[in-house]
């Protein structure tokens, strides 16, 4: 296995991260959905709206784990893993699990007792990775569905 270095993301990583975000969106067959920019991401990192880890092999960014802090009235603060992505040429090296574990270690060290994420039902490799640890599929076990409003829907609702 090649040696890699994992660092906490900073605003200076925004260009590298947005590039991987576009790659992930293309992989997920949702490329046209990405409207974020490197500059907006840079500001969001500065403002602590998003956090993460970026893995490097040499000078080349190999993968990322982006997350944010959320809040549950039942358990308090928790972490939502937004994007766990490894570039194709760096897959099957244990990097995804290492980046994911880094987030679990952060949660443990901060006393955070919940880590949530979503995965597309056809992404069998990601699901196989997640199946290596204990978790609960909330759709199956508790019947939770996740819903989303886009900007147009928000404006329409707010303007009613």
UniProtKB/Swiss-Prot annotation:
Keywords noted in UniProt: Acyltransferase, Transferase
Keyword Acyltransferase: yes
PROSITE patterns on file: GNAT (PS51186)
Quaternary structure note: Homodimer.
Domain of life assignment: Eukaryota
Catalytically driven reaction(s): S-(2-aminoethyl)-L-cysteine + acetyl-CoA = S-(2-acetamidoethyl)-L-cysteine + CoA + H(+); O-(2-aminoethyl)-L-serine + acetyl-CoA = O-(2-acetamidoethyl)-L-serine + CoA + H(+); S-(2-aminoethyl)-homocysteine + acetyl-CoA = S-(2-acetamidoethyl)-homocysteine + CoA + H(+)
Listed PANTHER family: DIAMINE N-ACETYLTRANSFERASE, GH14572P-RELATED
Coiled coil region boundaries: none
Full protein name: Thialysine N-epsilon-acetyltransferase
Species of origin: Caenorhabditis elegans
GO MF terms held by the record: N-acetyltransferase activity
UniProt: acetyl-CoA binding residues: 84-86, 92-97, 123-126, 130-133
Residue ranges annotated for the N-acetyltransferase domain, each copy included: 4-159
UniProt similarity note: Belongs to the acetyltransferase family.
E.C. number: 2.3.1.-
Function: Catalyzes the N-acetylation of the amino acid thialysine (S-(2-aminoethyl)-L-cysteine), a L-lysine analog with the 4-methylene group substituted with a sulfur. Substrate specificity: thialysine > O-(2-aminoethyl)-L-serine > S-(2-aminoethyl)-D,L-homocysteine. Does not act on polyamines, such as spermidine and spermine, nor on diamines putrescine and cadaverine.
């Amino acid at each position: 296995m090649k040696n890699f270095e994992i660092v906490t993301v900073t605003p200076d990583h925004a260009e590298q991260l947005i590039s991987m975000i576009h790659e992930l969106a293309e992989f997920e067959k949702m490329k046209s959905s990405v409207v974020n920019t490197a500059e907006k991401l840079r500001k969001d990192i500065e403002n602590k709206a998003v956090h993460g880890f970026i893995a490097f092999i040499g000078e080349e960014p190999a993968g990322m784990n982006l997350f944010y802090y959320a809040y549950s009235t039942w358990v308090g603060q928790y972490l939502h893993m937004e994007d766990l992505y490894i570039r194709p040429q760096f897959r099957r090296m244990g990097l995804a699990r290492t980046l994911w574990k880094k987030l679990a270690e952060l949660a443990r060290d901060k006393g955070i007792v919940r880590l949530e994420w979503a995965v597309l039902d056809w992404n069998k490799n990601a699901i196989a990775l997640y199946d290596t640890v204990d978790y609960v599929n909330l759709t199956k076990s508790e019947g939770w569905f996740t819903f989303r409003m886009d900007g147009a829907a928000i404006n329409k609702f707010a303007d009613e």
